[in-house]
Amino acid sequence: MNRRAVLSVSNKTGLVELARGLVELGFDLISTGGTFKTLTEAGLPVRYVTEVTGFPEILDGRVKTLHPRIHGGILARATAEHLQQLEDNGIGLIDLVVVNLYPFKETIARPGVSFQEAIENIDIGGPSMVRAAAKNQERVSIVVNPERYPEVLQALREQGEISYDMRKRLAAEAFAHTAEYDQCIAGYLTAALAEESVSSSSSPFPATITLGGQKAQDLRYGENPAQKAAFYRGADAAGTLAYGEQIQGKELSYNNWMDMDAAWGIVQDFSEPACAIIKHTNPCGTALGKTALEAYEKALAADPVSAFGGIIAFNRTVDAECAASLKAHFYEVIVAHEFSSDARAILQEKKNLRLVKVAQDGKPAHTPWKVRSIQGGFLIQEEDEGTTPISAWEVVSKRQPEPEELRELDFAWRVVKHVKSNAIVLAKAGQTLGVGAGQMNRVGSVKIALEQAGDKAQGAYLASDAFFPFPDSLEEAAKAGVRAVVQPGGSVRDAEVIEAADRLNLIMVFTNRRHFKH
């Protein structure tokens, strides 16, 4: 009796070539739906699944392969007892299962997709066959990745069978495939529930959670050479930085990815052309401009010493003029929505420079959570998305700000959100002038930012990611000539700090929203 293979795939890449090779090797093919149509149109002998089961498809195609004559043939072990049971029930063995699943991830990534349409793209029969075949790896081979087709055919041609070691590897890949698929579905449904519970007191976080991802590459090492590392893409994160395309340069490192994420997060908070230059996940220069070039030159001028070897992000296309200016300096990575052909030609001369473009196709569909590992577990929180609009700010000082001064403070406030706490940003004219990051006391960060700004602190605008516990930070700022301060407020000494602002003739506003970053 010929060996039998079930083929049921949504991704038709390499399908005909695989099926033709299996037929040449003496396999009988069983198939469903679009896969059956593709194979018959290619002139290949194939049996439709209902011919094998003797049972019609029902419920609009929801039930096709969920039948003992399919699952019995997959799950049976090569024991006398199992083989006798198959014979008694007219069931034939199935030796090879080739399945990939309904395109749920691609479906929910489409703009405007309905909840019902997403639900209909949840595969049931496919994962059932995948898991059955993977469980019975002792006898059955399961293939979920079209990239494996050539090596499967090669093994069958050269050895006459797929080795047990290879079957075990294929089974592990199959379970990872279904786990990622289920995680994508769970993430989508959880996000939908979170949206529904925004106005309720229920927690947006599920009682149990599985984190899924597909390994994109092994990295040379982690933060340090003694640490191994790898990069994984989330199952439901199309349109995000993780799905950006590297179009030039050396392989990205662990530290590159960390800094890219920090840089990309900053520029995405602005609608105007923006540029951020990052070192060790903190911005050493951030600026706005009428063009990408102007934003870059202002960001560079903010701290040209620290910018050396930095990671840069733009929320606009990098054109030739901007590329020519970038080329004059050493950077590790440049991230942008796009690079013009002329810009790429200019930057290609710096062969090691990594260029990454991230598609600008609307807001990506993903669960807005941040995950941090701790020893023995992990923490999950919502993304710190957006910030308090100017219209919701509270002016607490006697001195009142002009509209332009509020816009200056808004720029500093948007940047300070992305700086490690305790965080202070000095800015003016849409350009950071000094950044105090990661100090254990707030006045220490103020002093660092002021020292970095130097004389430019005169007339500058200061943002603090959290409240001032004492007036000392305002006193330091006023001595340097700072004009206005934006902070969340919320200290038990707010009244004392407000009194100091009035005494020092500072403008001060409260946003009533903190932006700690650890």
From Swiss-Prot:
Pathway(s) served: Purine metabolism; IMP biosynthesis via de novo pathway; 5-formamido-1-(5-phospho-D-ribosyl)imidazole-4-carboxamide from 5-amino-1-(5-phospho-D-ribosyl)imidazole-4-carboxamide (10-formyl THF route): step 1/1; Purine metabolism; IMP biosynthesis via de novo pathway; IMP from 5-formamido-1-(5-phospho-D-ribosyl)imidazole-4-carboxamide: step 1/1
Keyword Transferase: yes
Any single GO CC term annotated in Swiss-Prot or TrEMBL for this entry: cytosol
Signal sequence coordinates: none
Domain spans labelled MGS-like: 1-144
A molecular function GO annotation: phosphoribosylaminoimidazolecarboxamide formyltransferase activity
Protein origin, superkingdom: Bacteria
InterPro entries (UniProt xref): AICAR_Tfase_dup_dom_sf, Cytidine_deaminase-like, MGS-like_dom, MGS-like_dom_sf, PurH-like
One Gene Ontology biological process: 'de novo' IMP biosynthetic process
Reaction(s) catalysed (UniProt annotation): (6R)-10-formyltetrahydrofolate + 5-amino-1-(5-phospho-beta-D-ribosyl)imidazole-4-carboxamide = 5-formamido-1-(5-phospho-D-ribosyl)imidazole-4-carboxamide + (6S)-5,6,7,8-tetrahydrofolate; IMP + H2O = 5-formamido-1-(5-phospho-D-ribosyl)imidazole-4-carboxamide
The EC number(s) this enzyme carries: 2.1.2.3, 3.5.4.10
Keyword line: Hydrolase, Multifunctional enzyme, Purine biosynthesis, Transferase
Family label: Belongs to the PurH family.
PANTHER family hit by this protein: BIFUNCTIONAL PURINE BIOSYNTHESIS PROTEIN ATIC, BIFUNCTIONAL PURINE BIOSYNTHESIS PROTEIN PURH
Domain notes: The IMP cyclohydrolase activity resides in the N-terminal region.
Protein name: Bifunctional purine biosynthesis protein PurH
Species in which this protein is naturally found: Desulfitobacterium hafniense (strain Y51)
